[in-house]
Amino acid sequence: MAFITINHHAPADNGAAFVAENATLAGSVRLEKNSSVWYGAVLRADTGRIAIGENSNVQDNAVLHTGPGLDVTVGSGTSVGHGAVVHGCTVGDGCLIGMHATILNGAVIGDGCLIAAGALVPENMQVPAGSLVIGVPGKVVRPVSAAQAAAIKANEEEYLELARAHAEAK
């Protein structure tokens, strides 16, 4: 893993369960307890801060990047899917950001949301808690169903187990 200090700001690991050896964390990045950062992911905080909450996972090849004056905050129990781009925005607790979804500057994703694979959340969009967002540009189409909420929680739990297994395999 590459932990890179930028302008005297170094990544901080506060008990992450797993950080892949080819993940890159640059600048003011903070990983909380039991979080995980997977293969090929890039967390680049050269113009702001990135915070990854407890039990959250940033999956393979995802990119998280700050913007000038724009931090990235990912709440607890949230999954950022493979190849997602999360830029200068806030993602609440218990969310699932689908594979190859993009969330742009200033967007705020409420707790318990599902952002569908490939969706584009435009700049400054405010997504109410418990919403399902689909499309390009992304639109709130309905509340997250009970089955989808259970799947979000199951994904969090699966990645906690996978993180432990991968950490032990080193």
PLM features: what roles do these ranges have?
Residues A2-N14, L70-V72, S76-V85, D93, ...:
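C-terminal segments of enzyme domains that contribute to small-molecule binding surfaces
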Residues I50:
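A short, polar/charged loop-to-alpha-helix boundary motif
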Residues G15, A20-E21, A26-G27, E32-K33, ...:
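Left-handed beta-helix
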